[in-house]
């Protein structure tokens, strides 16, 4: 059975944000929202008209580290566990998706996700015509959305848009259960890791880190702090009840939908 996954080579990533932009175009992601993000660490400087840059790094060399992140399509996905209406689910091929007709906008999935990979449409989504070129239907107000591994492309035998449009070839996509697939060979050959693996989520996205710039390992606490920068996600976490390993694992069922006798 097919089990899709992704390898991101941080030694190749140049922080160009092409993955973020092509994702928005392909999936008609609303203005102000991003499914793909590239976090940046280091290299603080001021770009002045005189070109005066403060020194940084060893020998005065400015260094940058880039951490691409999106939905990790976890095998043990906490977002799937906490959804009270089963709107978030895992497909047979391992891709985690959302049924927008079922989504009630409770945002428990946002509270549960340790990667802050989901966004909520608080208002009626706005799109610029030049930004949306994909065939994916726009999501309505009041639902959560996120990366889908471009499942509409995958079903047609194509790679996700972020993979195809990465100018540095830093992304490798394929079947994790096929030992002969390129993505499986990368995982077997290189020293890969999963983000926040201590959470027990078992992501389907793997990262290659090196000791050389630009790719260098990020400490878990630093990464978790960077990921947790969305006010809606933090507010949802505060409303969560039972928390285990950093995310809510208790299914929340609205009283009006709960089963049982009156």
Curated annotation (Swiss-Prot):
Relate the induction remark in this record. Answer: By anaerobic conditions. Its expression is under the control of DmsR.
A GO CC annotation recorded here is:
plasma membrane
Q: How does it sit in the membrane?
A: Peripheral membrane protein
* Record-annotated disulphide pairs: none
- Cite the GO molecular-function annotations of the record: 4 iron, 4 sulfur cluster binding; metal ion binding; oxidoreductase activity
Q: Which Pfam families match?
A: Fer4_11
What the record notes about the co-factor is: Binds 4 [4Fe-4S] clusters.
Locate the residues binding [4Fe-4S] cluster 1.
13, 16, 19, 166
| UniProt keyword terms in alphabetical order | 4Fe-4S, Cell membrane, Electron transport, Iron, Iron-sulfur, Membrane, Metal-binding, Repeat, Transport
Annotated InterPro entries: 4Fe4S_Fe-S-bd, 4Fe4S_Fe_S_CS, DsrO-like, ET_IronSulfur_Cluster-Binding
Q: Where in the cell is it found?
A: Cell membrane
Disordered: annotated segments: 209-262
Residues binding [4Fe-4S] cluster 4: 83, 103, 106, 109
Q: Where on this chain does [4Fe-4S] cluster 3 bind?
A: 71, 74, 79, 113
Q: Which cofactor(s) does the record list? A: [4Fe-4S] cluster
Name listed for the protein in its UniProt record: Putative dimethyl sulfoxide reductase iron-sulfur subunit B
Species of provenance? Halobacterium salinarum (strain ATCC 700922 / JCM 11081 / NRC-1)
What's the encoding gene here? dmsB
């Amino acid at each position: 059975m097919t089990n899709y996954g992704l390898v991101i080579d941080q030694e190749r990533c140049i922080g160009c944000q092409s993955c973020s932009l092509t994702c928005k175009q392909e999936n008609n992601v609303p203005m102000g929202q991003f499914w793909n993000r590239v976090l940046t660490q280091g290299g603080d400087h001021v770009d002045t008209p005189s070109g005066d840059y403060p020194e940084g790094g060893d020998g005065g060399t400015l260094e940058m580290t880039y951490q691409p992140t999106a939905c990790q399509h976890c095998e043990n996905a906490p977002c799937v566990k906490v959804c009270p209406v089963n709107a978030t689910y895992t497909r047979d091929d391992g891709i985690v998706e959302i049924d927008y007709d079922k989504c009630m906008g409770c945002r428990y999935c946002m509270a549960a996700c340790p990667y802050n990979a989901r966004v909520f449409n608080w208002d009626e989504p706005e799109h610029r015509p030049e930004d949306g070129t994909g065939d994916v239907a726009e999501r309505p107000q009041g639902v959560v959305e996120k990366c889908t591994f471009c499942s509409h492309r995958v079903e047609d035998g194509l790679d996700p848009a972020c993979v195809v449009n990465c100018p540095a070839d830093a992304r490798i996509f394929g079947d994790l259960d096929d030992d002969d697939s390129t993505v499986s060979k990368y995982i077997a050959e290189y020293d890969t890791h999963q983000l926040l693996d201590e959470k027990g989520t078992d992501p389907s996205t793997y990262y290659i880190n090196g000791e050389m710039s630009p790719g260098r390992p990020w400490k878990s606490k630093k990464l978790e702090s960077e990921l947790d920068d969305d006010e809606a996600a933090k507010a949802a976490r505060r409303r969560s009840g039972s928390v285990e390993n950093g995310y809510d694992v208790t299914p929340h069922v609205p009283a009006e939908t709960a089963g049982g006798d009156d």
